[in-house]
Amino acid sequence: MVNQMLDLVKPELETGPDFIGKTFFEPAAGDGNFLIAILRRKLAALENRLPAETWPIESLFALASVYGVELLPDNHAAAQAALLGEFVDFHKRHGNPCGRRTNLFQAANFIVRSNIIQGDTLTGLDATGKPIVFSWWNRVPGESSTVQREDFSLTSLQNTAEGTLSFDFFPAYAPTRIDHVHKEA
């Protein structure tokens, strides 16, 4: 069933231009099955379409395009662990160093923790009662491995869809290599 659903968005997920950066949001992530299937497809497409030397950086951009919210703490932890595990397994299969001390692992872990949030999509609040905040990971034009991080709230997306303005203010981040985003924290 998951694969049939993903087949409906194959151009955005695997074959279209800029497929790596096309974002996907799961409002009820559960233990991450849908998110893992999305990442798995993106990584397979990356493997088929891009040179191997670009995989570490491009896989981080693929991971950064997957977002989710989960209400239950155990499911939230399972979703984060499974998504990170899928990422690490991809790199282990291809001989790319991705141990806990590598920048690749630490950046991936930071992205997963920033993009998969424990909270309630209906209220727009995280587990602590604060607004759910995500980060856009915008690729800097002309600098293939550099990202500009920009925070946004879930409610700002809902407000934009309703035609109202958001007055949320978030910190500004300097452009950085995507494999060094964990150093900003």
Predicted regions and their residues:
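SAM-dependent methyltransferase catalytic region
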Residues: 1-185
